[in-house]
Amino acid sequence: IDSEMMKVCLWASDYYEYPLGQVIFGALPSQVKRGIAIKDIKIFEDQYKRTSSKQMVVNLNDEQNSIFKKILRNIESFSTSLIYGITGSGKTEIYVKLAKEVIKKDKQVLIIVPEINLTPQTISRFKIYIDKNIQSYHSGQTLKRKMTTWLDVQNKKVDIIIGTRSSIFLPFKSLGLIIIDEEHDTSLK
């Protein structure tokens, strides 16, 4: 693992009072743990490959736009923001617009969802607006798929990752935004 991943693992080990070796072991794909060489893994194109060069434009209402601008002002520094709204209130549109701004700066975006079954619909929502490489990462994927995504993130071939908690351990090279959707969900604690 590289120095940035080691920093994340050291932090997680300290914060959760968990042995460093086990944190590192949990952060690595199983192929790496088993010593399978990267060259032995055939890399497939992602199932969520770009679909269209024509994307819809994100139109925010006044309240959404105000929230977007407030978060955008602080996006270059480490800061946290909470967007509170019921399902269907337009939080995703704000996320999309923030992600587009971050990607313009050649940064990657991580979107954490509480359940595996939310990844396909979240990917679909983002693909409507963003014509970039969007991939998922969660325990329901094959080992080959997870390793491919892990390598794509490491090689900065992915713009947006949508996944469950374990996706925080992906080896991002230029992470510019983390969105935790439904952060109140107990599966994210």
What are these regions (language model features)?
Residues 1-164, 168-189:
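Accessory, non-ATPase domains that flank or precede helicase/AAA+ motor cores in DNA-metabolism machines
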